[in-house]
Amino acid sequence: MKKVLIAMGLIFSISLFSSDNSSADWQIKTYSSAAPSFIGDFATVIGGKGETLREGSNGWTCQHGNPRPFPETGWKSAHEAMPVCHDDEGMKWMMALGEGTKPNLSRDSFMWMLHGDVGEDNLVPGVLDKKDTTPGQWIESGPHLMLMPKDPKTLENFTADFSKGEPYVMFPGTDYAHLMIPVEGYYQYQK
């Protein structure tokens, strides 16, 4: 019995080391699965420290979308990493949001986030702590597709109400307004 327990302990220890969420393998698998496989399997993958982990062949890029600093041991889960897959126009949008500048897109772009995100204010960009959120506007989303418009004004006739299950605008009235398109499982993290 003692040998069985020791063996089980060794197996458990080995499995802990093999699930290193900062590894290139984990990041490639996790980030590329933010989009359907026909996109993610052929996309370039950027690691948590900005390095290219895999060159792609389809013009799409997958990376973590969580704006918080990349943890030394990696993200705890795919959901926490908030992986996103986008094309070059989507990258322009991501960079502009991160730099606080106005996106300058040559056309509309789509982004996939099939692992969702860990929550933010639906009205105010950059508010990532629930206690600082506009009352009633905290949304922790499940799987979704996003439309990043070249001209955010084209979204003015869409609702900003995320509780209905229909496409809605996140960050309405700002340069970062985009259309959130919920897919199956979108509300799994709402409490």
Located regions from the model:
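Primary mode marks residue(s) on the alpha4-beta5-alpha5 output face of response regulator receiver
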Residues: 20-191
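Positively charged n-region of N-terminal signal peptides that target proteins for export
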Residues: 1-4
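Hydrophobic h-region of N-terminal signal peptides that target proteins for export
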Residues: 6-18
